[in-house]
A protein has these predicted regions:
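Transmembrane beta-strands of outer-membrane beta-barrel pores
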Residues: 52-58, 86-92, 112-116, 125-129, ...
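Repeated loop/turn-to-beta-strand initiation elements of outer-membrane beta-barrel proteins
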Residues: 44-50, 79-84, 114-119, 150-154, ...
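Bacterial N-terminal signal peptides
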Residues: 9-20
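Predominantly the C-terminal beta-signal and adjacent terminal strand-loop region
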Residues: 157, 169, 173-217
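Residues on the lipid-exposed face of transmembrane beta-strands in outer-membrane beta-barrel proteins
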Residues: 36-40, 70-74, 106-112, 140-146, ...
Length: 217
């Protein structure tokens, strides 16, 4: 609980001051992310899911990666959701060189709702394996959204911090994402998430336009 409180304070600081800088120190790239998600609800508490993702990079001139994810979630109570997942990525390294990498993640999400406002805090531990090397990170995401009880459109804004667990300095942010978007209930089983994301990293920033289509049954 103390970790969640501490991360929440950091999130508030980032939200207030993290976007106040007039420019980033590196040249930015424009990317697109496209994802199709399927979710099967076993009962009121358990569900399984899978998704297929395509990412483009270098100002949408080159394929970045294909991604496949499978996972499951358990909701022990109304405000807490626990999940696990496995991901595999086929990445484009350029010069006709491709490689696979694998990742697993463990997630805990706490969410609260007051009238039309919904706020959630997600903590995700992930470990990535890449040609014998491994990378361990903690991803912390704070998300607020307009979620009326009746309606099909829900705009939102989220901020996410990536923190390395491999370094001695824990509070060094490897990556940050600022993401405004809108979720739309297209039909009883279909949903659409359209978003813009700015990803800050020390190597290069990215402007990302994304579409996620979901099907639930």
């Amino acid at each position: 609980m103390s970790r969640i409180i501490l991360n929440t304070k950091i999130w508030l600081f980032v939200l207030l001051f993290g976007m106040s800088f007039p420019a980033w120190a590196q040249s930015d790239d424009f990317n697109t992310w496209t994802k199709f998600k399927v979710n099967y609800k076993i009962d009121s508490r358990f569900s399984v899911s899978g998704d297929l993702e395509l990412r483009m990079k270098d100002d949408v001139s080159r394929l970045d990666r294909w991604g496949l994810t499978v996972g499951g979630s358990y909701r022990p109570c109304s405000f807490l959701n626990l999940g696990v997942g496995y991901e595999t990525h086929l990445r484009n390294l350029g010069d006709s060189d491709w490689k696979f990498r694998h990742r697993y993640h463990i997630t805990a999400t706490v969410s609260f709702r007051y009238q039309w406002l919904k706020v959630s805090l997600r903590e995700r531990f992930q470990q990535t394996f890449d040609r014998g090397d491994s990378e361990t990170r903690l991803r912390s995401r704070l998300k607020s959204s307009y979620a009326p009880t009746k309606g099909i459109v829900s705009p939102y804004f989220s901020v996410e911090i990536y923190q390395s667990l491999d370094d001695t300095s824990f509070w060094r942010a490897n990556r940050m994402r600022y993401r405004p978007g809108v979720e739309i209930a297209l039909a009883k089983r279909w949903s659409l998430d359209a978003f813009y994301c700015y990803q800050y990293a020390s190597s290069q920033g990215r402007h990302i336009a994304g579409i996620e289509v979901g099907y639930s049954f």
